[in-house]
Swiss-Prot record:
GO cellular component: cytoplasm
Cofactor: how and how many bound: Binds 2 Zn(2+) ions per subunit.
Cofactor: Zn(2+)
Protein biosynthesis listed as a keyword: no
Family recorded in the similarity comment: Belongs to the zinc-containing alcohol dehydrogenase family.
Top-level EC class as recorded in UniProt: oxidoreductase
This protein's name: L-threonine 3-dehydrogenase
Cysteines joined through disulfide linkages: none
Gene (name only): tdh
Binding site for Zn(2+) 2: C93, C96, C99, C107
NCBIfam families xrefs: PRK05396.1, tdh
Residues that hold NAD(+) according to the record: I175, D195, R200, L262, G263, I264, I286, Y287
Protein keywords: Cytoplasm, Metal-binding, NAD, Oxidoreductase, Zinc
Origin organism lineage: Bacteria, Pseudomonadati, Pseudomonadota, Gammaproteobacteria, Enterobacterales
Amino acid sequence: MKALSKLKAEEGIWMTDVPLPALGHNDIMIKIRKAAICGTDVHIYNWDTWSQKTIPVPMVVGHEYVGEVVAVGQEVRGFRIGDRVSGEGHITCGHCRNCRAGRTHLCRNTIGVGVNRQGAFAEYLVIPAFNAFKIPDNIPDALAAIFDPFGNAVHTALSFDLVGEDVLVSGAGPIGIMAAAVCRHVGARHVVITDVNDYRLDLARKMGVTRAVNVSRESLPEVMQALGMSEGFDVGLEMSGAPPAFHTMLDTMNHGGKIAMLGIPPGDMAIDWNQVIFKGLLIKGIYGREMFETWYKMAALIQSGLDLTPIITHQYAIDDFQKGFDVMRSGHSGKVILNWS
């Protein structure tokens, strides 16, 4: 079958032919319809330090997708041929303390689809049936293909009560923008998003944020004053991994504020712990999606009217995959989808 693979330990990604994946007793086989390019895939393309330490070569990459079930293992229940599915990209062990307690998103033995095992940039993907999620009929393929990153956004945004609260989102990448849209949809008062990329700040405005602030030109405290915010943000969602953004978040949080952190800093990050202590801040680390509560929330949010379509800015046929990676690497895109069918 055709697949996009990391064939060499250098910059790039290549179309190749690989064997059809084997189907286990508890697995399903999915014929991929659409797959989206994740920031992780760009890291792998660039062959940065993280990728060099993490990705075995060769590796079929990709983990954001939607497709149709074409085969089921003999022990599988609840799925049948023809079902339209996406899937959780973190395959968990089922045996550690967190897995046995139902907190599978905290499994210490997680294996990543398209990172540690064959991924979704291929004609067919095999995953454990446990990891598959049926897509409701009224959710289109393009939105289903971005459920994985949407899940990061939902998990982060819904970590704390948002109703009537003022929220700061640092980082206007696609996940940050989707998180901001979730905050607005569920009843936050002011949702302010910060970045230095004007293209993505414009995209955030299309998604309905209260203010999109280019912090290289605008003062966040002045924006807060213009909005009538005299005490600071109640909730912070750190999506950038940029130390200056996190420092600004700490500066502008209200006493008793709550921060959810999804962005990954490039290395050790020093912060002013006095702010955390004397403001009584709560900081929560976020990884992946809660299995599978986040997935049900994702579907329900879209079915209740949350419109994510503006975040999908580019779609390409799979043979034009290089164009997709080029636009992702440029920073002038939202989500980029590759069409396999």
